[in-house]
Amino acid sequence: MSKAVKILLVNGPNLNLLGRREPGHYGHHTLAQIVEQLKLLAGEQGASLDHIQSNAEHELIDAIHQSDADFIIINPAAFTHTSVALRDALLGVAIPFIEVHLSNVHAREAFRHHSYFSDKAVGVICGLGEQGYRYALDSAIARVRAAQEK
């Protein structure tokens, strides 16, 4: 029997404002509501989900460094376009990850089109709202289970 799958969900700056910040781009649910639903979905699949949200880059880096997760789902938010340090943290721990964005970053301002993460991510999901997190969770669990069966 395969071991339980551990997922780390990392959310970057300003995502604590979900539900009130630009709901046209980011939706009406709070981050707490989204995370609660993801934890339930993970549990239904025999997986666990830990979560961190921070507006401080070093806190996200520390959480990644300390993680024993099998897979990371990350919405780096504004750090997408600026953080070599967060990229290096992900590469340093060598935990596979999926990059998620609630809005379609390619349909927004030009500065949002560049990501320091996309070229190293297993996959990138953007523009699908909170459903993107669910797709990432399903994919992460499936990928870990497939690797465990090898």
Swiss-Prot record:
Gene Ontology terms: biological process: amino acid biosynthetic process; aromatic amino acid family biosynthetic process; chorismate biosynthetic process; quinate catabolic process
Annotated Pfam families: DHquinase_II
Record's keyword terms, sorted: Amino-acid biosynthesis, Aromatic amino acid biosynthesis, Lyase
GO molecular function: 3-dehydroquinate dehydratase activity
Annotated site residue numbers, Transition state stabilizer: 21
Binding annotation for substrate: 75, 81, 88, 102-103, 112
Reaction(s) catalysed (UniProt annotation): 3-dehydroquinate = 3-dehydroshikimate + H2O
Pathway assigned to this chain's UniProt record: Metabolic intermediate biosynthesis; chorismate biosynthesis; chorismate from D-erythrose 4-phosphate and phosphoenolpyruvate: step 3/7
EC number: 4.2.1.10
PROSITE patterns according to UniProt: DEHYDROQUINASE_II (PS01029)
Active site (record annotation): 26, 101
Biological role stated in the UniProt entry: Catalyzes a trans-dehydration via an enolate intermediate.
Subunit structure: Homododecamer.
Record-linked HAMAP family: AroQ
Family statement: Belongs to the type-II 3-dehydroquinase family.
Name under which the protein is recorded: 3-dehydroquinate dehydratase
Gene name linked to the record: aroQ
